[in-house]
Every structure is written in C-alpha cells, then in structure tokens.
C-alpha cells in the first residue's frame, strides 16, 4: 500500500467537494475547485520553505514535522479585518476538505503571513488558535513572513502531523538505547 512507503500522507477526498459546493455545480467545475485546492496546498508547503521571512521555516523544519509522521492535514486560511490572523488560523484548521481534524497532532508547522502592519497580538492569537488543538507535548515550529501583496489580508498555513498509524516509524532496538 502507498502508506507503507511514505513518511506522511495528506488526503483530500473528492467527496468532500459536495460539502463546499452548490448542489447544482457541474462535476467539471467541482474537480477544478479540487485541483485549485491541491495546487494551493502544494504552493503552501513549498512557500513555507522558499519564502524568506522574519522567522524562517526551512526544509529541516518541514522534515522534522513530516518524517515518519503517518497521517497529516494541511490547512490554509485567509482573512481580512482587525483580527485577520486569528480568523485566518481558524479558517485553516476548519476546512471542510480536511479528512481529519488536527486535534492531538504531535507535530505542527505554522506560518503566518501578512503585511508589515500585522500586529504581534494578532500573530500570538493566531498561534494560540492552532496550538490549542495540538497534543500538549507537540513539537510546534513557527514561521512569520511579510508579503505586502496580501494588502490587508492575513494568511495562515498549517501542516499538522503525527496522528493515526505510522507504519514507517522505526522502533529502536534494545542495543541502541544508551546505558545510563
């Protein structure tokens, strides 16, 4: 099975399109919407690594969260207004296209993006919205980038992993443990 050879699997089921689409939407339009969401997801993950930031996230951070992590979820939210970052965070973790919630995730990667005028309080509240859903002992990696092209919008990208079966997670042999 595919899961047996992957570190992490993010599933976005096509049948969830019914939840976010008008009941009269044409199938071809629904699949275009699905493709757009997948494209945004790939751009979101690659943007985590390639977009320079105030607090950078690099490939090693992504690897830390996704290595042998089993199932993962990806959420991208965007919002405008006074509480744009917290609202974008809520949108990122509430997407009806996610196969699972991020509740109990053992690893979470968060990137908050906004213009130069994004307030520290907004960033802190957005991070709190997300981390409250994770496991109490989760590894949280945080990034903050500035993108003036967003105007007054804030965008939050979340990758949460480390729940569900993890077939590739290697268990240390007894000889590998250090004697203390």
Regions found by a protein language model. Give the residues of each.
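Tubulin/FtsZ superfamily GTPase core signature
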Residues: 1-180
